[in-house]
Amino acid sequence: MPLSDAMPALLVLADGTAYRGWSFGATGTTIGEVVFNTGMTGYQEVLTDPSYRGQIVVFTYPELGNTGVNPEDEESARPQVRGAIARNICHKPSNWRSTQSLPDYLKQHHIPGIFGIDTRALTRKIRMYGAMNGGISTEILDEAELLEQVQAAPNMAGLNLVREVTTSTVYEWSDPTTAVWEFNPDGTVKNGESLTVVALDFGVKRNILRRLASYGCRVIVVPADTSPEEILKYNPDGIFLSNGPGDPSAVTEGITTAKALLESEKPIFGICMGHQILGHALGAETFKLKFGHRGLNQPAGLTQRVEITSQNHSFAIDPDSLPEAVVEISHLNLNDRTVAGLRHKSLPIFSVQYHPEASPGPHDADYLFAQFVHQMRTTKQATTAEVS
């Protein structure tokens, strides 16, 4: 599309900074927290990841939409972002899997975007001053008028956005990672009886469910406000706490449930929001990072093993608040030394701040799914032996 045919658009940040560009996707006005993602690939997975609910995403890679979109790469049923910001947009994608252009896809789902702005300068600003609310509009092109709406919007801290993305009904997930994309999980973990995992849905990504299914798990997904009693009625071999959006300290229903589930002594595995929820259940606190971690190359580790990980989060666990007698740090983010993993000292319970399913991203941490399966099998065998 020639720029002469593009509709003008305006981006205004909460501090009054304004950027003028052109519209792609839907027209209208949208307001959310402006954050940046440094990944070179996986824009469709980012746009449809429920963890981005309430946010406007700046893509730092200068080209966006070159490979179009397709139904298989969606992490949920629709885009979850409030808006998208890009340097350049491709209106005519070229890829054998593409079924639709990115602008048409966002227009279909009523998601506004702006392109043609200096995304490098915008990213540096967020990095220096922190993530902040912003607004994109094709209707309001007066900076002061749009700024007024942006400043009236609530901040991310204190928001429970899980209620907007969790499932409303219980369902069972059985689809594994598609064979053409399978990257050889440890086949030994599939041997034996199928394991039942109840996944508490705070905004779960489909590829996490696929990895659990690939490792031989029967996955039952339940709403975030499901009581511990209802969860335990399924007699699960393990419990999974999923990723999700917003402030973890505001998800009081999840924290209360996780705290009760700890008493069951069943294996528990948490990812991202689930990691933070578990931290709260164990007595820790979380805090908001200046601009968060969003990208595909975050190093994490503690000993001599380092994993390159995919991350997407605004909050982190305060290490000084962890009860040292109960839990230990298993991983640190090696860029800023924030907590990236927890492990219970006596129970089969662990969590990571990053995404081991890595869709997109490196597969360094896929072993964590095998570790979860191993803990479930070991616990099940020990329980069976005690009964017999």
Swiss-Prot record:
Keywords in alphabetical order: Amino-acid biosynthesis, Arginine biosynthesis, ATP-binding, Glutamine amidotransferase, Ligase, Nucleotide-binding, Pyrimidine biosynthesis
Enzyme class: ligase
Location of the region described as CPSase in the Swiss-Prot/TrEMBL record: 1-192
Catalytic-site annotation from UniProt: C272 (nucleophile), H355, E357
Catalytic reaction equation(s): hydrogencarbonate + L-glutamine + 2 ATP + H2O = carbamoyl phosphate + L-glutamate + 2 ADP + phosphate + 2 H(+)
One BP annotation, GO: L-arginine biosynthetic process
Documented EC number(s): 6.3.5.5
Record bears the keyword Lipoprotein: no
Job of this protein: Small subunit of the glutamine-dependent carbamoyl phosphate synthetase (CPSase). CPSase catalyzes the formation of carbamoyl phosphate from the ammonia moiety of glutamine, carbonate, and phosphate donated by ATP, constituting the first step of 2 biosynthetic pathways, one leading to arginine and/or urea and the other to pyrimidine nucleotides. The small subunit (glutamine amidotransferase) binds and cleaves glutamine to supply the large subunit with the substrate ammonia.
Protein's recorded name: Carbamoyl phosphate synthase small chain
Source organism phylogeny: Bacteria, Bacillati, Cyanobacteriota, Cyanophyceae, Nostocales
